[in-house]
Amino acid sequence: MDKAFDEIIGNSHTDSSSNHKVTRYRRRDLRNELGPRLGFAPSDAASRSKDRLYREREEPPLPKRIRISKIPLDVSDYTLDDMIKEFGSPIFSKIFDNKEDRTCIYEFEDPEVLEKIVERYNGYELHNAKIEVEIYQPQRKHSRMNAHNRRKQTAQEQGRGRPGSHYRQRPNRVSKKNKGREKNNTPTSVEALDAELDAYMKG
């Protein structure tokens, strides 16, 4: 009879186990891979940083430009245009003035022109001053912003110092008014009450 009872219990347990569905979760790293496929942006900051770097690598670099610096302030724009005109018409030009000198930037459709301008005018004397001519690679705006944000974040982390150091527990302060209340609320002993009652009756 005990054997039959055990068989009944075993069968009922097997039936309940077969009807019960067990949910098995996949590994977290595999589940996270479904986010981009479903159109959800990755929540991990490292993933966003990798995506941004990947996009920047895919973007083609900007065309190189020529920079002419240390130009005397009394040199006119027309003089600079005449100097560049012999190499063709630039597709981009900009002139910057500061307190000491001028700087102009040019971009040409033919990159080989840049080398010729450097050979022709680097160290060229203009109004008793030697100008400097160089070829440089301009950066995209978001690249400069990322570099600025990284420097800013580093400065903030250095300013914070040790993590958690700015969370300081302030000591509990009790005002003088509360101290007075605490003294008044102190329970009086039975002997003191009897003494006060005797003094009141005698008086």
From Swiss-Prot:
The modification N-acetylmethionine is found at residue 1. GO terms for molecular function: DNA binding; RNA binding. GO terms for cellular component: nucleus. It is found in: Nucleus. InterPro entries: FoP_C (IPR025715), Nucleotide-bd_a/b_plait_sf (IPR012677), RBD_domain_sf (IPR035979), RRM_dom (IPR000504), Yra2_RRM (IPR034396). PROSITE patterns: RRM. GO terms for biological process: mRNA transport. The keyword Nucleus applies. Pfam families: FoP_duplication (PF13865), RRM_1 (PF00076). Residues 139-153, 163-180 have a biased composition (Basic residues). Keywords: Acetylation, DNA-binding, mRNA transport, Nucleus, RNA-binding, Transport. Residues 1-60, 137-203 are annotated as: Disordered. Residues 64-138 form the RRM domain. It comes from the Eukaryota. Residues 47-60 have a biased composition (Basic and acidic residues). Residues 11-20 have a biased composition (Polar residues). Associates with mRNPs. Interacts with YRA1. Belongs to the YRA1 family. Involved in export of poly(A) mRNAs from the nucleus. Recruited to the coding sequences as well as poly-A sites of active genes. This is RNA annealing protein YRA2. It comes from Saccharomyces cerevisiae (strain Lalvin EC1118 / Prise de mousse) (Baker's yeast). The lineage of its organism: Eukaryota, Fungi, Dikarya, Ascomycota, Saccharomycotina.
